[in-house]
Amino acid sequence: MDGHHVDLAIIGGGLGGVAAALAACEKGLSVILTEETEWIGGQVTSQGVPPDEHPWIEEFGATGRYKLYRRKVRDAYRRIMKVVDDDKALNPGNGLVSAICHDPRVTLHVLQELLLPFQLTGHLTVLVNATPVKVEKQGRRVEKVWISSGGRLTGIEAPYYIDATETGDLLPLAEISYVTGAESKEDTGEPHALEEADPLDIQAFTYVLGMEYREGGYHVIPEPDMYTFWRDFQPGIWPDKLLSFFAPHPITKEKRAYSLFDGGMGFPFGPTGASWIHLCSG
């Protein structure tokens, strides 16, 4: 069993964990950053999800470090991929959901580049494929976090720990009180909170499907199990069949048509979609 003694231990290597590591290393602290997957970067890398940003991100509403990250993503395309585009608001993937859609490997490259100087000076240690499995406490104080990686246990001791995991993995391990879902008005005093708390009111998990259209081909497979059920299934809150080109508007909940190909009249290529694309692209 190995061991690490550092000023700050960050468990979870998503964007938040990386940002915390950079801030601490810039202050001269010794830091260890652990990540349970093969890559740091969290949703932007391992899950392939573009940054979910507000419409004014190009003008205001971002930290200096996040602005630097965004610039480096765009610069990577110009420098490495030889993209000839002087637009400061370059959207490499030309996606709808973000003004900076890009290949997950680019974020991985950018984050590793930002962290490398501190790794070379010995201020930072990064452990991937490292999962927290046990927490040792003395009273209310966390004394050590045990990480499992490749069948080996590593103990990490630090005066300060940051839980930057996707789902708060250290909370149950450390037996720290926590809640899930949506709190009630009585819990928080928020006027728009639920009347009663709902522990299951959380953001849904998303499974991404990669699809390719090949004109003229026929690629229909035999009907899988429960095909008929899912073909015809319509949830109570849905305006049409779940697997169709109709879905509720995210704000008004009105029925909205979608289009698969450019030139269609449904979202995102129809009139309202075109306006949204223009808004997101600045």
What are these regions (language model features)?
Residues 2-14:
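Beta1/beta-strand and adjacent pyrophosphate-binding region of the FAD-binding site
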Residues 5-7, 27-30, 121-124, 154, ...:
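Loop/turn elements at helix/coil->beta-strand transitions in domains of secreted/extracellular proteins
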Residues 45, 128-129, 139-141, 149-160, ...:
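Flavin (FAD/FMN)-binding glycine-rich loop and adjacent Rossmann-like elements that form
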Residues 17:
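N-terminal Rossmann-fold NAD(P) dinucleotide-binding loop
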Residues 29-30, 35-130, 134, 203-206:
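Conserved N-terminal/central alpha/beta ligand/cofactor-binding core
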Residues 2-4, 30, 137-140, 146:
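Residue-level recognition of alpha-helix boundary/capping or hinge positions
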